[in-house]
């Protein structure tokens, strides 16, 4: 698994599981809002009043409406504390 994926997947998965509202800014400046319903290697399914499939290559920034617990986004948090 690529290093980018090892950070990206736990972050998006925590947003999905906790149903945290997010703002997604696209590279063209458009702001999308909703909840992460699902994601894969190439797209994020964003749900608001409708579901939108957003290609990751078009995304600049993902901003959660509230902070995520560090353990939720770092699968190796326990290992880091023991070192």
Curated annotation (Swiss-Prot):
InterPro entries: Hfq, LSM_dom_sf, Sm. It comes from the Bacteria. One of its GO terms (cellular component) is cytosol. Pfam families: Hfq. Keywords: RNA-binding, Stress response. RNA chaperone that binds small regulatory RNA (sRNAs) and mRNAs to facilitate mRNA translational regulation in response to envelope stress, environmental stress and changes in metabolite concentrations. Also binds with high specificity to tRNAs. GO terms for molecular function: RNA binding. The lineage of its organism: Bacteria, Pseudomonadati, Pseudomonadota, Gammaproteobacteria, Alteromonadales. Belongs to the Hfq family. NCBIfam families: Hfq, PRK00395.1. This is RNA-binding protein Hfq. HAMAP family: Hfq. Homohexamer. Residues 9-68 form the Sm domain. SUPFAM superfamilies: Sm-like ribonucleoproteins.
């Amino acid at each position: 698994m690529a290093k980018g994926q090892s950070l990206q997947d736990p972050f998006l998965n925590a947003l999905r599981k906790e149903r945290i509202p997010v703002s997604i800014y696209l590279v063209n400046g458009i702001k999308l809002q909703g909840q992460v319903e699902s994601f894969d290697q190439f797209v994020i399914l964003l749900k608001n009043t409708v579901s939108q499939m957003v290609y990751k290559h078009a995304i600049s920034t993902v901003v959660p409406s509230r902070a995520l617990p560090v353990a939720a986004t770092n699968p190796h948090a326990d290992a880091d504390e023991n070192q």
